[in-house]
UniProtKB/Swiss-Prot annotation:
GO MF terms held by the record: ADP binding; ATP binding; proton-transporting ATP synthase activity, rotational mechanism
Keyword Ion transport: yes
Enzyme class: translocase
Name used for this protein in its record: ATP synthase subunit alpha
GO cellular component terms attached to this protein's record: plasma membrane; proton-transporting ATP synthase complex
Gene giving rise to this polypeptide: atpA
Naturally occurring in which organism (per UniProt): Rickettsia conorii (strain ATCC VR-613 / Malish 7)
Membrane topology qualifier: Peripheral membrane protein
Catalysed conversion reaction: ATP + H2O + 4 H(+)(in) = ADP + phosphate + 5 H(+)(out)
Length: 510
């Protein structure tokens, strides 16, 4: 049987097409020096900044420095597995992490690998860790509230969806407690079917102790909040490179919800340790140090992260990503380098004071210097009705209180104002892990501002509040329902509330 030349050519072409080409061109370099989580690599002429490289042992590295004759890479893992003279190959890829609802309820590391022992994560979608922040046209102004469940915050320093609100204070003043309470408070919204009410939460632990992270996971599990929460952990024992990339990875996970018309809340705990990790990397890469030995681009480090929190426009699906960065100060010094940087990037700050904390005012929010620059637009009308005067009254009380230390004889009006202020401070106190629904907060603050507590002894204010709320939940549920559904206090509801409170105060004082 003779084959025609055309048929021979066709057969050969088919055979050639079916051959799997095994030889691939790889760009390979060599490790010149390695130590302290940094590798200097020679021979990768075309490598790009931010590209992932792979060492002989399988450990990955991230290229940060491009020099004349070598590149500097941070090692994302154990640097003991990288030796001088090892081969390093380009991957021609940037860092990506898994995103999606499959991550909810899980604890992952900075690269999105599960570390909770519950098996693999079945995520179909991956995103780059460094994404461009949405532009001005893609955004819309903040208009919906994020209810933290904390009276002092929801009434005086309200937070809106898409806002960046800094939580700042010394160590052990309750910064993480505010963040965890906010996560727990979202449980009520997740029990409803309406997707637009739900806020998915992401907690990023940067440079924390493992025991602290385990404690937070346990607390959230006990409260039933892990179902809608994801924890990204880069603890103090991990490489500085992982602590540096953890917030960016977590932000990409949060952007998945934002870009799909859902709402997410991300907590960075804390960005002081993040800046320290970046300073360590920069100094080891021999970049010139600036103020407090931080590199020159430490502002950009945080601004490019926090600018990714946004409220998206209707055309973009109306999703939002709200950021609560945490900064730890040293001896209340808010004017240090990193605190001032982050204050200038964010839309307001909640300032926690150790002095108030030790006095037993918890949450220890200093109302005088805490602000929310955009959140008041998101506050519900009922809260505006009752909380409008609280900030002024508290400021006047603080002034009179410091003034009254110098003189013992006070006129009755001043004395009454100080007593009223003390009761306001008392009603804003709250136990940890006990967030209040917004309608109950409104009733509590109404009681404080309308001077129903004047006849109640100061040490019994807390007891009064507990009993009053229990009574209203059992017998006057219609008042709470009306505030919740109407989002304002109608005249009819106010009459009912006044009648109930007058009777309750009489009974209680007896």
């Amino acid at each position: 049987m003779k084959l025609k030349p055309i048929e021979v050519a066709e057969i050969l072409q088919k055979e050639i097409a079916n051959i799997n080409c095994l030889s691939e061109l790889e760009e390979v370099g060599q490790v010149i020096t390695v130590g302290d989580g940094i590798a200097q690599i020679y021979g990768l002429a075309n490598v790009k900044s931010g590209e992932v490289v792979e060492f002989k042992s399988g450990v990955k590295g991230l290229v940060l420095n491009l020099e004349n004759d070598s590149v500097g890479a941070v090692i994302m893992g154990d640097d003991n597995q990288v030796q001088q003279g090892d081969n390093v190959k380009r991957t021609k890829a940037v860092l990506e992490v898994p995103v999606g609802k499959a991550l909810l309820g899980r604890v992952v590391d900075a690269l999105g690998n599960p570390i909770d022992g519950k098996g693999d994560i079945a995520s179909k979608e991956y995103r780059h860790i460094e994404m461009k922040a949405p532009g001005i046209i893609e955004r819309t102004s903040v208009s919906e509230p994020v209810q933290t469940g904390i009276k002092a915050i929801d009434s005086l320093i309200p937070i809106g969806r898409g806002q960046r609100e800094l939580i700042i204070g010394d160590r052990q003043t309750g910064k993480t407690a505010i963040a965890v309470d906010t996560i727990i408070n979202q449980k009520q919204a997740h029990s409803l079917t309406n997707e637009s009410d739900k806020i998915y939460c992401i907690y990023v632990a940067i440079g924390q102790k493992r025991s602290s992270v385990a404690q937070i996971v346990k607390k959230l599990e006990d409260a039933g909040a892990m179902d809608y929460t994801l924890i990204v952990s880069a603890t103090a024992s991990e490489a500085a490179a992982l602590q540096f990339i953890a917030p960016y990875s977590a932000c990409s996970m949060g952007e998945y919800f934002r870009d799909n018309g859902m709402h997410a809340l991300i907590i960075y705990d804390d960005l002081s340790k993040h800046a320290v990790a970046y300073r360590q990397i920069s100094l080891l890469l021999r970049r010139p140090p600036g103020r407090e030995a931080y590199p020159g681009d430490v502002f950009y480090l945080h601004s490019r992260l926090l600018e990714r929190a946004a409220k998206m426009s209707e055309e973009k699906g109306s999703g939002s990503l709200t950021a609560l960065p945490i900064i730890e100060t040293q001896a209340g010094d808010v004017s240090a380098y990193i605190p001032t940087n982050v204050i200038s990037i964010t839309d307001g700050q909640i300032f926690l004071e150790s002095e108030l904390f030790y006095k037993g005012v918890r949450p220890a929010v200093n109302v005088g210097i805490s602000v929310s620059r955009v959140g008041s637009a998101a506050q519900i009308k009922a809260m505006k009705q009752v909380a409008g005067s609280v900030k002024l009254e508290l400021a006047q009380f603080r002034e009179l209180e410091s003034f009254s230390q110098f003189g013992s004889d006070l006129d009755p009006a001043t004395k009454a104002q100080i007593d009223h202020g003390k009761r306001l401070v008392e009603i804003l106190k709250q136990a940890q892990y006990h967030p209040f629904p917004v309608e109950e907060q409104i009733v509590s603050i109404y009681v404080g501002t309308k001077k129903y507590l004047n006849d109640v002894p100061l040490q019994k204010v807390k007891e009064f509040e507990d009993k009053m709320l229990t009574e209203i939940r059992l017998n006057k549920k219609d008042i709470l329902e009306s505030i919740k559904n109407e989002q304002r206090i109608t005249e009819e509801t106010e009459q009912k509330l006044k009648a109930f409170l007058e009777n309750f105060v009489k009974e209680f004082v007896k």
